[in-house]
UniProtKB/Swiss-Prot annotation:
Binding site for Mg(2+) 1: D192, E196
Cofactor: Mg(2+)
GO-annotated biological processes: isoleucine biosynthetic process; L-valine biosynthetic process
Protein name: Ketol-acid reductoisomerase (NADP(+))
Protein family: Belongs to the ketol-acid reductoisomerase family.
Gene this chain is encoded by: ilvC
NCBIfam families: ilvC, PRK05479.1, PRK13403.1
Domain of life: Bacteria
UniProt: NADP(+) binding residues: Y26, G27, S28, Q29, K49, S52, S54, D84, T85, A86, Q87, G135
Keyword field contains Electron transport: no
Keyword Magnesium part of the UniProt annotation: yes
């Protein structure tokens, strides 16, 4: 089914310019949204808890900062860009008591709405504007007069103005310059979670670690294994990002292409596909979200345990040593402190 696309001419910037926008959170997306909206002539305030390290940064960039409750009371459009696991609490304690008839509640990701962790009053417009790129790219493209494609969705529309408002907001951050795709909270949430778990984060990570283990257990040097299964992954991903799988296969050697065709299906086979379907089913049923919420309620104990085990994998030790040799690699703070 063809998606519905919107561009600059389909959006009226004056709609969002006539509203007061509170952006809850000042991370990667919050920073990009708020600065770009401000530069588009929108009245913006940032909602951050007392003591947040981001307060000084936002104020240095000329933005007005208040608590989430204060800016929610002031605003008539509230964009929630805090971490997924913090949103329900912020909504209950700070946003919901300050909602008024005619307000709009927007999100950058649909998880909390789709799985009913947040239930907005019926008089509130509920929508989503989600750029398909990290915040620094959204901001850089906006400043350069370009844009990053974005998604919009409307879950609740008591006044029939949700889509026009979402498009106006998307235009304010540069999304309509590139193109905006209309979707649903269900589709955005489930596809996003599946991509993260089965391919981008979970699947890729386990493929890399297992490849490393196979090579080291076969007697190859850990350094050689690291280069072949992790370091060179960026070269392949960049080619796919720029021109798809066909561009990647065109760009690598015939040996690599031929070997990939023969061996790829031996690694990712019909059984893998069935397990991926099971992962999707867990997402669709809400099972993953229930486990996510339980982890938060238990003090993140499951997540911290998984993080610790992952950090102790031998590929991390080898990788840190090799990255010391790579002056061109941006080192994370945890490795340079």
């Amino acid at each position: 089914m063809a998606v519905e696309m919107f561009y600059d001419d389909d959006a009226d910037l004056s709609i969002i310019q006539g509203r007061k926008v509170a952006v809850i959170g000042y991370g990667s997306q919050g920073h990009a949204h708020s600065l770009s909206l401000r530069d588009s002539g929108v009245d913006v305030r940032i909602g951050l808890k007392e003591g947040s390290k981001s307060r000084a940064k936002a104020e240095e960039q000329g933005l007005t900062v208040g608590t989430p409750a204060e800016v929610s009371e002031w605003a008539d459009v509230i964009m929630v860009l805090a971490p997924d696991t913090a949103q329900a609490s912020i909504f209950t304690n700070d946003i919901e008591p300050n909602l008024k008839d005619g307000d709009a509640l927007f999100f950058g990701h649909g998880l909390n709405i789709h799985f009913d962790l947040i239930k907005a009053p019926e008089f509130v417009t509920v929508g989503m504007v989600a750029p398909k790129g990290p915040g620094h790219l959204v901001r850089r493209q906006f400043v350069d007069g370009k844009g990053v494609p974005a998604l919009i969705a409307i879950d609740q529309d008591p006044k029939g103005e949700g889509q026009a408002l979402a498009l106006s907001y998307a235009k304010g951050i540069g999304g309509t310059r590139a193109g905006v795709i209309k979707t649903t909270f269900k589709e955005e949430t489930e596809t996003d979670l599946f991509g993260e778990q089965a391919v981008l984060c979970g699947g890729t990570e386990e493929l890399v670690k297992t490849g490393f283990e196979v090579m080291v257990e076969a007697g190859y040097a850990p350094e050689m294994a690291y280069f072949e299964v992790l370091h060179e992954l960026k070269l392949i991903v960049d080619l796919m990002y720029e021109g798809g799988i066909a561009r990647m296969n065109y760009s690598v050697s015939d040996t690599a292409e031929f070997g990939g065709y023969l061996s790829g299906p031996r690694v990712i086979d019909a059984g893998t596909k069935e397990r991926m379907k099971a992962i999707l089913a867990d997402i669709q049923s809400g099972e993953f979200t229930r486990r996510l919420v339980a982890n938060v309620e238990n003090g993140n104990t499951e997540l911290e345990g998984l993080r610790k085990a992952n950090a102790e994998h031998p590929i991390e030790v080898t990788g840190k040593k090799l990255r010391d040799l790579m002056s061109w690699v941006d080192r994370p703070i945890t490795e340079t402190a």
